[in-house]
Amino acid sequence: MQNKVIRLGEIEISNDKPFVLFGGMNVLESRDMAMQVCEAYVKVTEKLGVPYVFKASFDKANRSSIHSYRGPGMEQGLKIFQELKDTFGVKLITDVHEIYQCQPVAEVVDIIQLPAFLARQTDLVAAMAKTGAIINVKKPQFLSPGQMGNIVEKIEECGNDNVILCDRGTNFGYDNLVVDMLGFSVMKKVSKGCPVIFDVTHALQCRDPFGAASGGRRGQVTELARAGMAVGLAGLFLEAHPNPSQAKCDGPSALPLSALEGFVHQMKAIDDLVKHFPELDTAN
């Protein structure tokens, strides 16, 4: 199977190229924090030679509670994104939830993300595809890896073949997620070689069945990320925070920003090792 290569400036996103770190914070909490977090990622990735794309949400539209923080909104969020791009020269990824958001977001951001809960909404998928931007599709927790081919087909039928697939875990009973490591190769196959990345942060979610916000298992982020990187992936999707216990969204799953360099160093070492191995044909 031929692996597709998506080019984002000087960055090449592909399953057999050096991994790309899609890293940042869960939601934009403030302009100053976004600058702090982005600067930390840029310093680490430049030092280690890892291609980098900054990620954050301007609106967490699917929070469990109506009282939970959602973000600054699209208008203010895009201003912050533009400042990050101007200051650090980074590429950007963020999610959209409504059709009207697609075009204005695509004018600032390099990759627009289709949220897991909305991944089968055909009108939204079509609107995103028609912007011509690179599309990152989050695999719904309730969908098998093999079904992702149908979503890719929708995007391609709209004239856009710049598609990335992202696994963020699969429902395992109530209020728990697991990651099927065999699912990554299934997604590569059904998408005919699209880049596949791993959202290790959201895969660590573990809900309180009666709570208003997600819990998480950030103490296990390194183990889970190591396992995913050993498969051979196009990228890793990661959220970090200066003080996870005070984060306004998904703090229990966020990597402490102080641990970022050591974490990325390990992921790069695994990626370098795996991608130097020759591919073995064990199916025949």
UniProtKB/Swiss-Prot annotation:
Q: Which superkingdom heads the taxonomic lineage of this protein's source?
A: Bacteria
> Pathway membership of this protein?
Carbohydrate biosynthesis; 3-deoxy-D-manno-octulosonate biosynthesis; 3-deoxy-D-manno-octulosonate from D-ribulose 5-phosphate: step 2/3; Bacterial outer membrane biogenesis; lipopolysaccharide biosynthesis
Q: Where in the cell is it found?
A: Cytoplasm
**UniProt GO MF annotations:** 3-deoxy-8-phosphooctulonate synthase activity
- EC number of this enzyme: 2.5.1.55
Reaction(s) the record says it catalyses? D-arabinose 5-phosphate + phosphoenolpyruvate + H2O = 3-deoxy-alpha-D-manno-2-octulosonate-8-phosphate + phosphate
Name a single GO cellular component.
cytoplasm
Q: Which UniProt keywords apply?
A: Cytoplasm, Lipopolysaccharide biosynthesis, Transferase
In terms of InterPro entries, this protein maps to: Aldolase_TIM (IPR013785), DAHP1/KDSA (IPR006218), KDO8P_synthase (IPR006269)
Main localization, broad class: cytoplasm
Q: Tell me, which GO biological process terms does this entry list?
A: keto-3-deoxy-D-manno-octulosonic acid biosynthetic process
UniProt family annotation: Belongs to the KdsA family.
- What protein name is recorded for this chain? 2-dehydro-3-deoxyphosphooctonate aldolase
Per the UniProt record, the source organism is Pasteurella multocida (strain Pm70)
